[in-house]
Amino acid sequence: NEFWKRTAKFWMKLFGINFAIGVATGLILEFEFGTNWSNYSWFVGDIFGAPLAIEGILAFFMEATFIAVMFFGWEKVSKRFHLASTWLTGLGATISAWWILVANAWMQHPVGMEFNPDTVRNEMVDFWAVATSPVAVNKFFHTVLSGWVLGGVFVVGIGCWYLLKKRNREFALASIKIGAIFGLVASLLSVWTGDGSGYQIAQTQPMKLAAVEGLYEGGTNVGLVGIGMLNPEKKTYNDGKEPFLFRIEIPSMLSFLAERDANAYVPGITNIIEGGYQQKDGTIALSAAEKIERGKTAIGALAAYRAAKSAGNEEDAQVAYKVLQENIPYFGYGYIKDVNQLVPNVPLNFYAFRVMVILGGYFILFFIVVLFFIYKKDLSKMRWMHWVALLTIPLAYIAGQAGWVVAECGRQPWAIRDLLPTSAAISKLDVGSVQTTFFIFLFLFTVMLIAEIGIMIRAIKKGPEV
């Protein structure tokens, strides 16, 4: 069918432009681990490097091979092989996302490793625990589905641009229909994965959950803040100021989402810092001050172990090793100087989360309205809807970035939760060097972004092949 062939070629061209930029920026990102994050690379390179290596060897080469056939194989290979190459390109991109998100999830919830005091490195002991972590699985589905939502919004928006310009009507309506159906399904599924993300955060990163909700004092039957404004004067968890100027809550909803029990206890920022509450495993939560002391003990025990080993004193080495093993879960806390460092930026996380959720709800409504107009009305005549669709494109990018703000800023101060704070993960570089390279890459990435947008606009203006 020539119509669908032209349609596929057009969207393939836009995909290829984004793919090229993704490869260019991704390669630069790989080098950053050695240049800017050398302590991190040494401390956990044995674990973090494995999924990235698999991503590069398996997924990237798979994409690179079959994308060439997908683009240049028209009329040169059989239709079945070309179709298979197209699907394998998409599969390769999905596998690539899996291993990248496995690495990211491990930073948020480190599992499957042991600390080796002889090398001062964490070493992998259970690959499958890392690769199939519940945090990784949920993060993968939520991230990929969010990407599909963005793709659906993009296709609908560009299709509406053609309708606005009164061009390629048949192509535009067919693309809009597919984009809206695909986007709606992905949007609805992302609600489910988003709920799973909230549950996983509650189990593994309670401080992030508390920051996202602006929850300072926990309790049972905790409500979910639907609408609220934080008090800008509240600077620390214990300054006595009210956290909100106003808020509207859904009663008991946070307890239900976090623990699947409306009566469950959810700790707040103050509770996590001060400790003393009963955790799900029945143990009493340690205070942040106690964790910091145990972290310092672990760091001291590591130094004592290495000194004893160097001196050939096995007895002292074993004593130090035992102390280290008892306190290793708190190793990263030894680098924390003030308990307030353990609290993420509450306003940033609180508002970013709500931007993501509100836009996610808007996308569901948007796709439903678009499909209604396609099947029940004449969408090609609704200019106001064309403008709405165009303006929705940047909102999809904003929603995705808001989600990553919560994911990455919500876990601060940790590069690896409880094991390595961000401040200790960096390379020993002077400020001037970091600033110089930052602005160089900022300039390069800005140029690449401008080039990408320019090339895409030209391709869109040209339209599908006639």
Region locations from a protein language model:
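Polytopic transmembrane helical bundles with strong interfacial aromatic enrichment
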Residues: 1-466
